[in-house]
């Protein structure tokens, strides 16, 4: 065998080994949050990730198809395009969704909150919004001063997460229950139901993780 033939044979062996390594590479089975737009085409559920031109089929692997039921309640089955945040595993072009964080009709992409945001919550009558993460918990209410308290990681007890904070002027208690919350004004559904108590006033709404 000539030197040239030896190099060619070695190249074939290396290429074969690389292909086998790629084929043997296991799928990361750790569920991660997927952010993107979702629609139904015939019997298929199509997911398009934020800031990405790729597409993936969606397979609902949640218990009793709970993810699909929630999305259909927002309008997926009726042909509406949704912005969704789904917990799942991407496997060979299929997003296997096991849980949902939020879904809104024609909503815009929201990238992960990172270190600055762990939770968001909002409600109506009266209008309010809460952002928790980083160094602060901020509560905004229509026509009233913003309340800012030091952030501390929410305490988890089963399907309930809590936060308590206070300063010289405000005492705040936040309770988040992992039960589906629907907001007709926001045209969406969220994975958590929020109850916020500020100096004895109770505010109700929905919450989602960031």
Features from the language model and the residues they span:
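Central antiparallel beta-sheet cores of small beta-barrel/beta-sandwich binding domains
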Residues: 50-64, 121-175
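Charged, amphipathic alpha-helical segments
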Residues: 30-32, 67-71, 111-115, 120-127, ...
